């Protein structure tokens, strides 16, 4: 077993195919097949169920998590060595969710990070917040955006924004200065399954209320479209709304006010690579000048200096 074989195994699982993995890695399909067969022979188990779209076996899924952890540790070792030379090269994998993270938070951080460390190759994967959490747990990404509270990972607080009620133009509630959760239960409700979805669910549960869920959407744009058509009301994070104004919906403050806190998370601060540490440091400089970390992480991060 070697790291190349583990990298190929990880790529096949991510791409769900031998051909796609070969294209991604720039090797032949036969090379991919030989690597998987060599691992299966060494372990004495089948890692994949063969077919048009190969699927992991149960033991394959367990071994994949360990393989990804080993690959992450190997990359961390490379970056520790690179840091001693001024972090001139390396890889950083970032997990991002929704418009708030992908469109508002990530771009200014990436701009400063790339200016400081142009040799670090950055890969960004976007998905629902639940998927980002799974990527972190499986070590598929080095750092990811999450909402707080989050007890699963070590977190670094970045920002908070208001949750607002989203109403169709002409809805009876638009005449009110603020809207309660109980008010929203009288209309069909569009529930988002990304970003602030879990927070909204907890708000209703804590209030002992059950919204009349009309639809559930993975994409915020679908939720906004449902409101704009007049099909439903909803609750969204204010920072996730498009910057351009529209007359198709109206936002109203919630009463009592509710906020969403966004943070960066890592599986384990003890295994953070230098590239990850610097990404978090720059993000906190951009959005949290005080440098306050999240609930689990209090320490200051050591600076990695770029050598010339």
Language-model-detected regions and their locations in the chain:
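Beta-alpha-beta core module
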Residues: 152-162, 176, 221-271
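A short LG(V/I)-centered, amphipathic sequence patch enriched
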Residues: 40-58
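Alpha-helical linker/hinge and terminal dimerization helices associated
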Residues: 42-43, 63-85
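Hydrophobic hinge/microswitch elements
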Residues: 128-132, 137, 141, 195-250, ...
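Secondary-structure junction motif
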Residues: 187-207, 272-280, 287-295
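Short helix-boundary/capping micro-motifs
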Residues: 11-26
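Flexible hinge/capping segments at coil-to-helix
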Residues: 86, 155-163, 167-189
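Central regulatory/effector-binding core of bacterial HTH transcription factors
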Residues: 91-151, 217
